Amino acid sequence: MYGIYGLFFAAVALYSVALVIYRLYLHPLSRFPGPKIAAATGWYEFYHEVIRGGMYIHEIQRMHREYGPIIRINPYEIVINDPDYYTTVYVASNTRRSEKWYTLQGTGLEGKALSFFSHFRTCRTRMHMTDQIVGAMGMTMGHELHRRRRKHFDPFFSRLGVTQIEGVILDEIQLLTDRLEGNRKSGRTIQMEHVMAAFTGDIVTKICSEKSPDMIRHPDFGKEWYVTIHTYQLQVHLFVQFPYLISLTQLIPRGLVMHFSPGAAAFKSLHQYAFDHITEAKKDMGRAVKVQQEAGRSSVFRHVLSSDMPGTERETERLAREALQLFGAGTATLVRAFSMIFYHVLSDPQMRGQLREELKDIMAGYPAKRPTWQELERLPYLHGIVKEGLRLSYGVMRHLARVSPDQPLQFREWTIPAGTPVGMSSHSLHSDPETFPEPARFLPERWMKDRHHPNMNRNWVPFARGSRMCIGMNLALAEMYWVLAVLFRPGAPQLELFETTEADVVPVRDYVGGIPEFGTKGVRVRVV
């Protein structure tokens, strides 16, 4: 018996040594710069992401300082830090095929060697691709499938589509304003992350399914929604490293999952909420005689359910994944951008005064007379505040890897083999001191025409670029311009910071979206 165990462990040890040798000396990426330990095993990334808690992005920055602009960050992935190369990695759909990459890092077994373990990795990859989120458009790996899925959502999230639902946004903002006014001089402390989670969550659910949880009316605003999304966000690295855990959570009763893993329970709760939304939308479709097709008059999922998509694409489970991603993405990163802006505007009387002065004329007739989103965009100081809020909150903080499946990429003297995941991060581009002097400072003035650096727009990528850029960009921008215009206009509810510092908003940990240091309390205000 012991002999069998001994042979097994000897075989595993021999395989591990052979795999490390292959990765370091025979792998197609073996000549690329980077630390040997990162090239040898995914456990190095696991340590920085899971054990240290979303800190690999800072280790990657250190690698760039030591090894240069192109580095190998794990056995199979390249990261580049060169703003001029961004549009080569993130290309339009008519330039070349571009596929998304989701790693199964951390086990140390995901090699490309021809072996049983290589087959095991392939099986796990296939399982991952059919897992809870990968069925969603934004997580679709294949180029053509992503294009086919996205075209059904584009009309709702295009600039035209968003302008057609300005009324929905403005009605929600009026509710938000009324709720804040209702707390005037009450002495109550309000956490703005909960407020904005309610606001953004209500809007995206209403657009997607015509119904919303109406969180803006809840006594605690969107606290439960925010905590659920944030708790799941804190588990994202574990799920990326071990994607089969997501499938397992669906097989375990929610109460038991909650006891052992609040993060997994949060995912299960979000998934169930999305699943129920799609189920209800299908019931409504069955009762409907005619479905309106116009983006401004129908919900996203009514439109999709009545489209010419194949039946498999309209299955409840797959659309629930779409809903899950739209609901989560429509809240998490945008809340961080709002937090960044609220803190800096409320903590700087001069900035607040300048913004109010700029809004005085255009918002004079509000709410009877409402300017358009396009008119608000033309206000230079408001424009600068929105730009800085998104720059310093990063959008998606981590590198977003893309794969060129058909042709190699050339970066300077380096030829990157076709099929290699290549990523770049908004964190690097937004923190570039050559483009953004004093990059850590919140300076709306830097976006003014007389101070505008020619490369600032090149480096500003909170929504990414190319065929897979964030589909919700226009909705997010419209929400930001309108919320800031209404809440900082003359006569708006007067918000005052309560025990909030810059550390409460500065992203230091990468959980796809950046989050502040653990233990910070967010932006807390009182209405005076």
From Swiss-Prot:
It is found in: Membrane. Its EC number is 1.-.-.-. Variecolin and its derivatives produced by employing P450 monooxygenases from other fungal terpenoid pathways exhibit anticancer activity, thus, the skeleton of variecolin could be considered a privileged scaffold for developing anticancer agents. This is Cytochrome P450 monooxygenase vrcB. It is an enzyme of class 1 (oxidoreductase). The chain crosses the membrane at residues 5-27. Keywords: Heme, Iron, Membrane, Metal-binding, Monooxygenase, Oxidoreductase, Transmembrane, Transmembrane helix. Its main location: membrane. It is a single-pass membrane protein. GO terms for molecular function: heme binding; iron ion binding; monooxygenase activity; oxidoreductase activity, acting on paired donors, with incorporation or reduction of molecular oxygen. One of its GO terms (cellular component) is membrane. Pathway: Secondary metabolite biosynthesis; terpenoid biosynthesis. Heme binds at C470. It catalyses: variecoladiene + 4 reduced [NADPH--hemoprotein reductase] + 4 O2 = variecolin + 4 oxidized [NADPH--hemoprotein reductase] + 6 H2O + 4 H(+). Its cofactor is heme. It comes from Aspergillus aculeatus (strain ATCC 16872 / CBS 172.66 / WB 5094). Belongs to the cytochrome P450 family. Cytochrome P450 monooxygenase; part of the gene cluster that mediates the biosynthesis of the sesterterpene variecolin. The first step in the pathway is performed by the variecoladiene synthase vrcA that possesses both prenyl transferase and terpene cyclase activity, converting isopentenyl diphosphate and dimethylallyl diphosphate into geranylfarnesyl pyrophosphate (GFPP) and then converting GFPP into the tetracyclic variecoladiene. The lineage of its organism: Eukaryota, Fungi, Dikarya, Ascomycota, Pezizomycotina. Coiled coil: none annotated. PANTHER family: CYTOCHROME P450, N-ACETYLTRYPTOPHAN 6-HYDROXYLASE IVOC-RELATED.
